[in-house]
C-alpha cells in the first residue's frame, strides 16, 4: 500500500510537471491554470468574432519571436495575488500583444506580468503592448525587460493606469495621434522618454 501510494504520488507530480498546452494560429475560449503554461509555437490570432478569457495564474510563453494579433474580445484579468504572465520560453524574446482596429474596447489586461518582449517589427506596432485604432484598458500590470516602447497607442483612447513599466530600451508609454487616460503609472529605467506625446496626441494624467 505504501509503494502504491508513493507511485500514485510520483505520477501526480510528473503529470503536473509536464502539463502544458501548445498553441498557434487562431485561438479563443478559456485558458485555465490546469492547462498552463500555454506555449506559443507560432504567431497567435484572436479573430474579430471570438473571445479569449485567460484565468488568473496562467502563464503564456512564446517559443520564439512570435506576436499575438488581437481583433476580438481579450480578457486577461488576474488578481493582485495571482497574476497572468506573458513571457519568453527560453532565451529568445517574443514580439508583442497587438490590439488591432477590430479589437473590442472592453478588452482588458489587468494584473499581468509582461516581460522579455520586443517590437513586432511592422508599423504601427512599435511597442510590446500596442493599441492601434482600439481603446482597451491596461491596469495594474508590470512591463519589464523589453526592447523598444513599453506601451504604444496609435489613434487610441486606451486607459493606461497603475502600471509599473521598467527596464525599457525606448519610450515607456508613447502616444501617436492618440488621446489616452494615463494615470498612476510608475516608470523607471526607461532609455528614452517616460511618456512621449507624438503628433497631436493628448492625455489625461
Predicted segments, located by residue:
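Beta-strand/loop edge motif enriched in small/polar residues
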Residues: 17-205
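Bacterial N-terminal signal peptides
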Residues: 4-15
